[in-house]
From Swiss-Prot:
Enzyme class: transferase
Pfam families recorded: Kinase-PPPase
Assigned keywords, A-Z: Kinase, Nucleotide-binding, Serine/threonine-protein kinase, Transferase
PANTHER family: PYRUVATE, PHOSPHATE DIKINASE REGULATORY PROTEIN 1, CHLOROPLASTIC (PTHR31756:SF3)
Annotated protein name in UniProt: Putative phosphoenolpyruvate synthase regulatory protein
Record GO terms (molecular function): ADP binding; ATP binding; phosphotransferase activity, phosphate group as acceptor; protein serine/threonine kinase activity
InterPro entries xrefs: Kinase-pyrophosphorylase, PSRP
EC assignment: 2.7.11.33, 2.7.4.28
Length: 273
């Protein structure tokens, strides 16, 4: 497939336009060249953007793809009528039809989605991130009653990135604990976690993949050996079965897929959108 230039145009930071655009582009096997045009908030800047888009179209002999999130209708009109790209306007596609359906005019405020520094949702996310960092890798057993999710699994099975994703994306207070040889000898989860079993979710991973990941960190060590990884994974999975907790393999799953499964299984009450 021919490499396309993709423009992301916004009268704000452009984060929403880029997130929306990348989610759509991910459905196609292509490596687009990204051009970001944030703060396109005047007619003059819109004309500059049009000239850049049209120059790219002439230079490459193919239409650029243009994703926009423009609240200013005058600016949008300049882009719509002047550019020679394929225009995909997020507000026109989603916001304006919703205005008709809801019979309510949207705020059309620039950067409304991202301007959360004074909101309750922002505060909830910051509190969740602080909690998750304080309870990363079993650093603390305190205040576990305040946790929304407690992840357990062998070292390097994906607990920390999943915890931080849950905190940043959903405002969930996520603790995580590594399962270690002492736990395997006792053949049960860490005692401090047992009162909170309903919040516990286990992560496992194929031993071969675990050994590969650990070798990147500590090459040729017993910790990273395939034999040790097989033993740890086997013990951890047996422990999870005995405890009756829900768990999944992270081997072929993205952080987003892991987090979504956890939300579906545990159904935490406190979610930030």
């Amino acid at each position: 497939m021919h490499t396309r230039t993709v423009f992301f145009i916004s009268d704000g930071t452009g984060i929403t336009a880029e997130t929306f655009g990348n989610a759509v582009l991910a459905q196609f096997e292509m490596k687009p060249r990204h051009v970001r045009l944030p703060f396109t908030d005047t007619v003059d800047k819109a004309h500059q953007a049009v000239r850049q888009i049209n120059h790219t179209a002439e230079l490459e002999g193919v239409r650029p793809i243009v994703f926009t999130t423009l609240a200013n209708m005058e600016v949008l009109e300049v882009i719509e009528t002047g550019c020679k790209g394929m225009l995909l306007d997020m507000f026109g596609t989603f916001v304006r039809p919703l205005e008709i359906e809801l019979a309510v005019k949207s705020n059309h405020r620039i950067g409304r989605f991202s301007d959360v520094s004074k909101s309750k949702e922002y505060d909830a996310r910051i509190a969740a991130i602080d909690f998750s960092l304080a309870h990363d890798d079993g650093q603390s057993n305190r205040d576990l009653e305040g946790a929304d999710v407690i992840l357990v699994g062998v070292s390097r099975s994906g607990k920390t990135p999943t915890s931080l994703y849950l905190a940043m994306q959903h405002g969930l207070k996520a603790a995580n604990y590594p399962l270690i040889p002492e736990d395997f000898e006792r053949k049960q989860l860490p005692p401090a976690l047992m009162p909170h079993r309903k919040k516990i979710f286990g992560l496992t991973i194929q031993p071969e993949r675990l050994s590969q990941i650990r070798n990147e960190r500590r090459p040729d060590s017993r910790y990273a050996s395939l034999e040790n990884c097989r033993n740890e994974v086997s013990e951890a999975e047996a422990m999870m079965r005995r405890a009756g907790i829900r768990w999944l393999s992270t081997t072929t799953k993205s952080i987003e897929e892991i987090a979504t499964t956890i939300l579906q299984e545990l159904k935490p009450e406190r979610l930030v959108y």
